[in-house]
């Protein structure tokens, strides 16, 4: 359960970073 949440956070972080870098 915790691992799933952590993976979700990491994925969200990458998505945000990718969006900011365009």
Swiss-Prot record:
GO molecular function, one term: lipid binding
GO terms under biological process: defense response to bacterium; innate immune response; killing of cells of another organism; regulation of defense response to virus
Tissue: Mast cells in gill, skin and gut, and in lining blood vessels in the viscera.
Entry's localization field: Secreted; Membrane
Keywords associated with the record: Amidation, Antibiotic, Antimicrobial, Antiviral protein, Cytolysis, Hemolysis, Immunity, Innate immunity, Lipid-binding, Membrane, Secreted
Keyword Secreted: yes
Topology versus the membrane: Peripheral membrane protein
One Pfam assignment: Antimicrobial12
Cellular component, GO annotation: extracellular region; membrane
Domain of life: Eukaryota
Segments forming a coiled coil: none
Residue numbers of Glycine amide PTMs: 22
Its biological purpose: Antimicrobial peptide with broad-spectrum activity against Gram-positive and Gram-negative bacteria. Rapidly inactivates both channel catfish herpesvirus (ED(50)=11 uM) and frog virus 3 (ED(50)=16 uM) over a wide temperature range. Has hemolytic activity.
Family: Belongs to the pleurocidin family.
Name by which UniProt lists this protein: Piscidin-3
Organism: Morone chrysops x Morone saxatilis (White bass x Striped bass)
Lineage: Eukaryota, Metazoa, Chordata, Craniata, Vertebrata
């Amino acid at each position: 359960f915790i691992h799933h949440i952590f993976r979700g956070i990491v994925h969200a972080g990458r998505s945000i970073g990718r969006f900011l870098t365009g």
